[in-house]
Each structure stands twice: as C-alpha cells, then as structure tokens.
Regions:
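Secretory/organelle targeting and membrane-embedding segments
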Residues: 1-171
C-alpha cells in the first residue's frame, strides 16, 4: 500500500517529572493482534546481584480485558541466590464486576455532560499542529506483512526491544 498505515515513534514529555524518560509507541493496521496496553519498563539496577534478569514491568491493559499486571524479579525461597519473574495481576472485571461497553460509556457521558471522555479543543489543535509538520515532510514508507508487528526497522527503535504485549505475555 502507498498509504501510511503504521507508525512507531519515540517521544518525550517536556517537564521535570518525565525528563529523560523515553516513551515508545507503535500502531498500525492488520498487525499481529489488536492490543491496547501501556507498559512501563523500569530501569535495571546498576549491578545485578542475582545474574542476568528481566526488567520489572508495570502493564496497564485497556479495552476488553482491563487490568494491571506487575512483573517483577523475586528471590526464590531458600539459601540459593536465584530469582525468577513473578507476575501479580488484577483483573478489573473480577474485582469490580462487568462494566458498560465502550459505546455505552461514551453515549452516557455525552448525555450527562461528562467532559472527561472527550478531547478538549486545545489538545485537538495541538495534535493537528504536530501532524501538519509531519505531512509537510513525508518520510519513506517501510512495507510490512499483514499479521506481523510492523516493519523490521521499527524493532531497531527500542534499544532492548519492544516489551511483549497481548498474547506474547505469559499470563
């Protein structure tokens, strides 16, 4: 296709709290699966006392299967200095019961005048300002196959690779 259907980008938030923290995002059509997740990958300590280990992650699952997962390295019981990844999971439907569907929530918010679910005009205008700059300087398209996670060169964007998402995660 000659139409842009995939984007992978590295972003930064320009304030003191998030200074120096890279934010990576990718989205596209006909990828391996549809997943709405935000993954926070914590820095590893300067020294790994228990050998090579996975990074600790905090995962927010959005959409049909809302929840929060924390994946962390925990020392195994006993005298040996061994760790393994342990996952702690909260399934929102289990904890809080089933909720309204997305369209039902949106229509209800519009009816009762709840502005929380709607984008403010200043955010829309700022988004268009960014998009206009991108459209003025088109970039080379990188094709990818349907059912993959995007073009190969998108993998190089994230130094240690993209965090596993969706069915890639052992739950």
């Amino acid at each position: 296709s000659d139409t842009e259907t995939f984007v992978a980008m590295k972003m930064h938030i320009d304030n003191w709290r998030w200074a120096g923290v890279p934010i990576y995002m990718r989205t596209g059509k006909k990828l391996s699966e549809t997943v709405l997740e935000v993954v926070v990958e914590f820095n590893k300590p300067p020294r790994e006392l228990f050998g090579k280990s996975e990074a600790n992650r905090l995962r927010f699952r959005l959409g049909a299967n809302d929840g929060v997962d924390i994946s962390l390295q925990a020392k195994e019981p006993g005298t040996k200095l061994l760790t393994r990844q342990v996952d702690l999971t909260v399934e929102f439907a289990h904890e809080f019961g089933e909720r309204q569907g997305p369209y039902e929530r949106l229509l209800n918010a519009a009816i009762v005048g709840d502005h929380f679910r709607f984008t403010r005009i200043d955010a829309v205008l700022h988004s268009w300002k960014i998009l206009d700059e991108l459209l003025k300087s088109p970039t080379q398209l990188h094709p990818y196959f349907e059912g993959t996670w995007g073009p190969d060169n998108a993998e190089a964007l994230v130094p240690n690779g993209w965090a596993p998402v969706g069915s890639q995660v052992n739950r």
